Amino acid sequence: MAQRDYVRRSQPAPSRRKKSTSRKKQRNLPAVSPAMVAIAAAVLVTFIGGLYFITHHKKEESETLQSQKVTGNGLPPKPEERWRYIKELESRQPGVRAPTEPSAGGEVKTPEQLTPEQRQLLEQMQADMRQQPTQLVEVPWNEQTPEQRQQTLQRQRQAQQLAEQQRLAQQSRTTEQSWQQQTRTSQAAPVQAQPRQSKPASSQQPYQDLLQTPAHTTAQSKPQQAAPVARAADAPKPTAEKKDERRWMVQCGSFRGAEQAETVRAQLAFEGFDSKITTNNGWNRVVIGPVKGKENADSTLNRLKMAGHTNCIRLAAGG
């Protein structure tokens, strides 16, 4: 019995046609053209030749540069400028020069060579250097505790007392120096008068021996008379050393309202002055003190004026 291929018969006709057409297309595809191959080979050859030429040309340039460097010995040309310090060294004269200052612009001059204005300025600078440095007053600030504020106020008082003591000591020294100068001048006057009077006594000695004794008595009486003058000059010294022991108050305002007095007191406390408010007959007075001695009160007033409180006045503690 003959076998039949049922599978091939079962496949549809279009699928058979598709397979046959695809095989025909694969057979009909053209091969790579020889012209394209030749162009690609030419491009590749030119690229390789260009690379070779570039590398070879660089080597030649490096060889020429090396030859130029060898011929030049590797040194730059000499500068044409002749430096100024060489001329100064050639024309320098031996000897020690006086120091110069860039601000002055010349040699240091002696006091005889200075102008009157320069001398005045020099004397002023020397006087400023002799003065004692000013001590800055420590001002209590708002964030301080009451104990710290009290400590700062105590330090201020101690500093004021020290400054006052130094000032009084300086005054006493000046008075002593002036007193010593006066005593020296008073002692020198009778010593100069004594030889003047001894000359006529010696001239009269060969003629009148009796007149010799009065001359000595007169010469001796004058130094004795000069002694009371010196004692009389000693008298002003204890009066100058006496101090004002009274107590004074410094008033910086009198207000009807308590708020104004508190603001003034706060300003004084901020600037380092210990003040208080006293009420009398409806008036609120801002006072500082009591301060012992008129000089201390005056110094407090001066410091208040420097701080800007010009309306402060000095009052007696009982007034």
Swiss-Prot record:
Effect upon mutating residue 254 to E? Binds peptidoglycan poorly
**Record field: compositional bias (Low complexity):** 143-171, 222-238
Region of interest (Disordered), residue spans: 1-30, 60-79, 89-113, 140-245
Instruction: Describe the location of the SPOR domain by residue ranges.
Output: 242-316
Phenotype caused by lack of the gene? Depletion does not affect localization of FtsZ, FtsA, ZipA, FtsQ, FtsL and FtsI to the division site. Cells containing low levels of FtsN stop dividing while their mean cell length increases. Absence of FtsN is followed by an inverse sequential disassembly of already assembled divisome compounds.
The Swiss-Prot or TrEMBL record annotates one GO molecular function as:
peptidoglycan binding
Give the consequence of mutating residue 5 to N.
Causes significant impairment of the interaction with FtsA
Membrane topology term reads: Single-pass type II membrane protein
Q: What are the ranges of the sequence repeats? A: 115-120, 145-150, 197-200, 220-223
| Topology, Periplasmic side | 55-319
Q: Which residues does the entry place in the Cytoplasmic compartment? A: 1-33
The compartments listed are: Cell inner membrane
Q: Which Gene3D superfamilies does the UniProt entry name for this protein? A: Sporulation related repeat
| Annotated stretches, region: Mediates interaction with FtsA | 4-6
Q: How does it assemble?
A: Interacts with FtsA via its N-terminal cytoplasmic domain. Interacts with ZapA, FtsQ, FtsW and FtsI.
Name the NCBIfam families on file: ftsN (TIGR02223), PRK10927.1 (NF008179)
Instruction: Provide the family line.
Output: Belongs to the FtsN family.
Protein's name in the database: Cell division protein FtsN
Q: Can you name the source organism?
A: Escherichia coli (strain K12)
Q: Kindly list the organism's lineage.
A: Bacteria, Pseudomonadati, Pseudomonadota, Gammaproteobacteria, Enterobacterales
**Which gene carries the instructions for this protein?**
ftsN
